[in-house]
């Protein structure tokens, strides 16, 4: 399920089964890191969309949370968002390809995955890479869900 009205209606009818909100974190860097930020952002988006596709009915994919710098203001904004979501979703998972988040533990479940430059790969290789990464994330989510 995604952040759109048709899925919101479906969620309200099936909310007992949809216990996980997924928020992609995407860095917006336009100075020296424009291409790298776009690459990591695209990878995070594709990965989160694939995760939602495979777990439709269990996860709710929210719009990406975009930021310029990982700083106190960004962290506080994410804490506020998490507090809002935790009232509806027992699990709030942040997904990113930005390695600077790896040490962050104040925001709950954070999945940091290294991005892969996809621009020169053929479609079948892209699919294979996304499937492999999605499988890794599924294992993390299964462990998270089994702790309840």
UniProtKB/Swiss-Prot annotation:
It comes from the Bacteria. Pfam families: DUF2487. This is Uncharacterized protein YpiF.
